[in-house]
């Protein structure tokens, strides 16, 4: 998924050197048709959340500008990731994901590096287990803090009433 239109040109150049490797990218070039099939192995899609997840589920590796949601989706699906951040929030996402072993960070879509990384990548299933437990972790945290919070809230309300 790319938000910088210049990245599309980089992908086209890379594809010319590696025409046998299938590439599916999503971009926000609204002036283009919804699906731009350059040839049998290069396709650009307009942003489409359903198609995006369908393509990601079947991909060998994922290259992105490091948006939070798509990085989490790739981690959940166990995909090796190359992150090419375009601004500070994405820099933070890329840094955090690389620390967790989810992928590599680059200044450009150097897809050779991603393919090399993908060969030895081992998904960390702990992330999936953590996500699946998220609801229970949150409920547990809320229950542990509910009694103390309620008491504090009522005390503050009582104090407010005294001043009225």
Identify the role of each PLM range.
Residues 16-19, 75, 98:
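Anion (oxyanion) recognition and catalysis
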Residues 7-8, 48-49, 67, 90, ...:
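Amphipathic coiled-coil/heptad-repeat helices and related helical stalk/stem segments
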Residues 33-38, 44, 80-123:
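Nucleotide-sugar donor-binding patch of glycosyltransferase catalytic domains
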Residues 54-93:
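A donor-sugar binding/catalytic signature common to diverse glycosyltransferases
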Residues 14, 55, 114-117, 141:
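CheY-like receiver
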Residues 116-164:
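C-terminal amphipathic helix plus adjacent low-complexity
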Residues 2-4, 66, 85, 130:
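Small/polar loops that bind or transfer phosphate-bearing groups
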Residues 1-58:
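Donor-nucleotide binding loops and adjacent catalytic segments primarily
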